[in-house]
Amino acid sequence: MNESASQEELRPAQENRKEDKERKWNLTEVKELHETLQSVPDVPVKEDTNSVVEKAMDEIKSQELNLEGQRKISPGSIKDSKTEASGNIAIRKSAKVIFALDETELKSKPEHTWKKNLFERMEARAQAMQQKIIDKENLKKELEKKAEKKLPRDNLAKEWFNTDSMTLNNTAYLLDKLLPTLVPGVENMLTQVEKKKVLTEADTPSKFDPINYLGEYLIRNNPNYIKDPGMSGYQRLMKEVTEDLKIYVPDTICNRVSKMKENVKQNRKQRESIDKIIVKVANTRKQALQEQFDEWILDPKGMIPKSVIQNVLQEFFQNPDFKLGSHCKQLDITDSTEPRLNKMEFTEYISSHIKDLKSEMFEELLKHLCHSADEFREVIKADMRRQMFAELFLHCDHGKVGFLDRQRTLALLELFYDHSSQMLRSLLRNPRQWPFIEFEEINLTELWGDMDNQKHIYEGFDKVLLEMNTLLSANHASKTQSKLLESPDQPKLNEQRTSTPSPNPPEQQRGVTAEQGPQRISIEEQQQGKKPTAEQELYIESVIEPGTHTESTLEQGSSRRLLTEQETHRESTTEQGQHKGSIEGQGPRRVSVSEQGSSRESVAEQGSRRESIAEQDRHKGSVAEQGSRRMSAAEQGSLRESVIEEPYQKSEQGPYGEIISEEQEDIGSTSQSRKDSILKSTKYGEPITSEYIEVPLQEKRSWEQTYEEEIFLSSELQEEVPTLSRKDHFPETTKKEVQKDKPCEPKSQKIEGKSWSGEFFTCNWKMKYVTFEDEEQANLIYGNSRFTDLHSIIRNIQSCKEVKGRTAFNGVSFNLLQFVQLLETFVGEDAPLSVSETLTSFFKEGYVETEQEKMNALEQFSQNAFQVRQRLLLEAIFQKWDSDGSGFLDLKEVDELLYTYKEGMEKESMKKAKLHIQFPKPHPGHEVRLSSKQFQNYIELVVSELRGNEDQVLESVVEFLMNALERSHIESLRNSARRKWLHQIQCAAETSGVSLEPVYSETFKALMQDAEAHGNKKISAHISLLEENLLLPEKGNVLLRNVACTLDDAQFVLNRVLYRDMKGISFTVVDEGKPIHVPQVQYHGNIFFWNQSRNKHDYNGSFLALPLQDAYMRIFGVLAVDTLRDPHEINIFLPHEIRFYQGVANVFSTAYHYVHSREHILHIVITGIGWLYDVTSSITSITTYFVEPSPAQDSDYVLRNMMVTGQLGLTEIHKNPPTIHRKSCIFRDFLFKCTDSSEVVLASACGETHIVVPLRERTGEALGVLDFNIGQNRMLLCQEYKDLQKMMKVVQVACYEILGEFSGEIKKKYILEIENVREVQRAGILFFRIMLLELQESIQLLNSMEFVSLLLYDHTLVTEPNSPQDSKSMELEANVKLVRDILKAVILFFHPELEFSSDFGSWDKCKFYVNKYLVNNICAFDPTAKHVEVNVQLIDEYIRDHSRTEVWKFGNVVIEHLYHWIHICSALMKITKQLNSGITPPLPSKTDNYMYAKMPGEGLQEK
């Protein structure tokens, strides 16, 4: 104990001594270092080397001894600097005051304090030790550097450096172990030898032995035992050589370290070089992007909308050839066009998205940017044109009613088209053809169409366009030159010549046909008999270039999509002035529909015309001369002239006083009836006199003259019209040259001489011009304090609108969107803006409404506003009344409340209203339920029967009902929440991409949320649908299959089947059609439990089964809800819960049929596409889109890409369809233009032509879009274009029928036997059924003499004398074979037994089967009936050798109808045989990304 205590007492004293020594050593180190740095003497040059070495060695030894002494100091003697300072300075710390702390906290505080102090002292010592070691190392390096400076380097040691692999190891070993001691020893030995003069005195014996001396030296200086006293210059260099040589010794640490250092060095250099290259490439790319920025058209501030660049990048990244889809995730396209980018921001933004692109991809991006810059220029041009047309609509809408008359608009377009020059007409589209006229206005015969494959819609377009561009450039050059040469008075003279009217146009003007264009030479020059100028000659020659006698001159409507009028052979101009010739046909040959430029007449008139074309009169206005026309029977009886054309027919002094061709004088019943309808089709049918349509004489002449100057002299158009229109109008060689030289061309910041204002409404221009009536009426209701209680309900109704932003097509009027789209389609994409300006001025002068029309328009506007207001108010009343969301009201309850209106004074009037409405059938409980629509109809009739102003009466009734319906705040909140959940079910169906899975999920979600929030229950639910029992018919004809259930019950319920002979009340619900509620299932005895493993004592709960009904009140399934999983003992369903569950069942039924209606439409489209692909070959792809509500609140709708059909006819159906947003389609906005206006859009994108056709709902709004991509082709051939129209007409009719059936508006029609099989299969054959019915109706309208003429045609051929075989006789023989084969094929359908009869080979005996019963049999024939047994292969053999072109050339309507009837019957028979494998529903699984389908069809032979 004493020893330990004494030792502990000695430790502080020893530590104090060590600290004192440490201070001394620190002071001495500093002094020695200071002296060493200052006491290094300069070595003289002539000083002896050995003495210098010895002095240096002595100094180094002394310094190293000092270092050794420092190493002996204990590390523990280092003292903290704070401790040293505390020995001199005393600091008094302030005391801490602690309030209300626990004892545990007080005890823990000192512990943390001493630990903290200990850690601080330890850290300070460690830092001091580390710093001391660093200082020592630095001092040692300084001493070595000094020694190197003092000692001269002996380069002889470098001779030891030899990397020879043979001696490398040995050399390294010697240099490292032996030579550092051996060399100084030899040197020392030689010095001694020299001192003792052993070599000089060789004969004198000496005791000095050099070997012994060397050995003694080596022993004394063994490096393992003796510290290195110092090194000479030779040794130091040898050491360096040793270190360098060790690097080359393999498998050593130095070698590996050196390799690592070398790799690191190389990687660093490579990284630096790569960084330099990256920076250089980035700068080069930025410079290229800055140069490319100048090719874009900019706003006045020199900026581009950011969304445009985002669209460009997205389109580039989505190119499948580049495989850059991952880059699209980084793009977040903005909704607004307000954010703009200047040149630097443009460069930085694009650079940030293309950092990892290769050089090849960057070059492709530059090309894409250049192309997009040109496309954006066209987009701005189209935007300027659309704004121009929108302002025109507002100008023509004098009453601000929001719509213009459709017939008047089309008539003005026809008038503008007829009086346009030939060159300008080549840029316009024909307003008498589709898509300007609707399918309902086209007869079936016309749709079978022109089969001439050699005729093209855009025949000769390139030539006309190039001539026009050449002329524009020539005129621009000549104008520029003439401006430099003309005198100051010359412009005035030119103006006088241009503006001088002609009182009497010369006769030679009248000789120019309208086909050549009513081009005029200067009137002053005509009167003086002067020749036209060179510029005018060039223009006139370009227009009349085909000559005075042309064949099939094409009237082209637009550079993109023109439905042309292919005219018949025309006589010369002089012959036309004297006598109008008609076409002389031989035999039954028929003139092409597209050549005639108008539609066919009725079937009876067509038949007579085909037989006597050559015998018709050749007077002006004859039917053969004008071309066949499409008109109804009443229109054929009496043709009335249009009042709009009267001024131009009466006046010869105006610019329209020229004689136009027969085609323009009689332009067909469609335009004639359309123009006549302007005079007679008012609301009340009152005629409109011509004085309201005609412009006063002087005013008419002035605007006609202005129009003439603008349209007939439109060769000059504008001074700065670009010489090249859109690049994809030229042939491939020209296109390549243009694209090659395009980057070299300077980019003007003007579009046809006009600067861009910076306004860009391509994505959201509806916000500026379009207003929707329901929103305006809702705002008016919000401002009316009488309906305060309904405001919140109406807001919910407006927010839950299905799809916003669409306009409905009604066939009577155009709203702004439709009007703008119509004019844009008429003008086309390539017409200069001056043409649009001319059309705008023409419309402003020509669109004149009578006072009666204006009043009718205002009445219609107010009526529409009243209907919208009425619908909103009545829907709000219905929802307030139906507070539980059941979806119906009791008629008895409604009547009881209505009869109290005005204290019962209007009771009799309300009873009269009930006589005009058909109420639904009473339910089993004698309860008549009114849906929302039926309730609105009932209240509308009540309002119409009450006395007073209709608007005031409506408001009074609504206010009475609103005040009579007292609802508590809790009921209102519950109603609002339930409405929201019900809306989510319907929204799930609309946004599901044609899938039922989201509908099931939202249905169960609504049930569970309501049970939890308003019933405090835990429920289970499942949906079972009725199916036909094919496997076990003895258990019943139908069964219930559980198709969906809540997640907890999936393993027990999903896909299970309930038969009629099993327990359960579900079939009772199906039979009775009313809900059944079982409060306590354990006591019922007829409940089937799916989970048989459950203990019988746990069967405690309620069960509710609800019927699922369609629009015809037919039951198709059961919705079951139970509370077996609820832990509460009392868990019965309350009345308000049952009513809400009925509402859920009702909304689910609507959503279910909504999805299936879209599914059936897809089947119809697939069938139509299959038929179209069998008869056409120019269509590259067909993409089908459906319209869905947008998930964003500020957007209107989105498009879902449902399926894509490739060039081979294989349809790829997407299970999870991609979503297309408007903001990402700036360069492909034609899809949204079509959906907005519900009109056909003809557009081009990326060098490909698109024909976009809407699929309309029964209301006229677009429910989908079909995008026909025809690739690089400018337009389809006439034959294929007619086939496209036929396909779309049938598809649209089938869609109307499907939608009407699902909504309950029309009753289902089962015409063919195959339609009774299944719903999906029925949708697949609906396309062919409609085509079959149309043909049967057309055949039924034929005259019996039409069939007899076929037999007489054969008889006349037989009675002809034998003549040599020439082309005419061969043609007649081919026609006879055609007639016989088609009639034999038809006979085989009804008399299949003749196949084995010898009479069938004799035509004379087969003739007897062509009798009066044949037409009846054809019109009543069902090719899908089970009793029909026909040899389809034999029938195909008879018609296989005859193409559609051959049938068309024959020109007999009977043969044509029968030919198509045979093909459709054959296709239906094949579908019937392939029923199970041919049509597969694409629903409802979403496990795969896509599936493929190809519908069976019957192709028509093409030759």
From Swiss-Prot:
Ca(2+) binds at residues 882, 884, 886, 893. PROSITE patterns: EF_HAND_1, EF_HAND_2. Residues 869-904 form the EF-hand domain. InterPro entries: EF_Hand_1_Ca_BS, EF_hand_dom, GAF-like_dom_sf. Keywords: Calcium, Metal-binding, Phosphoprotein. The keyword Endoplasmic reticulum does not apply. Residues 1-23, 477-518, 544-656, 730-750 are annotated as: Disordered. This is EF-hand calcium-binding domain-containing protein 5. It comes from Homo sapiens (Human).
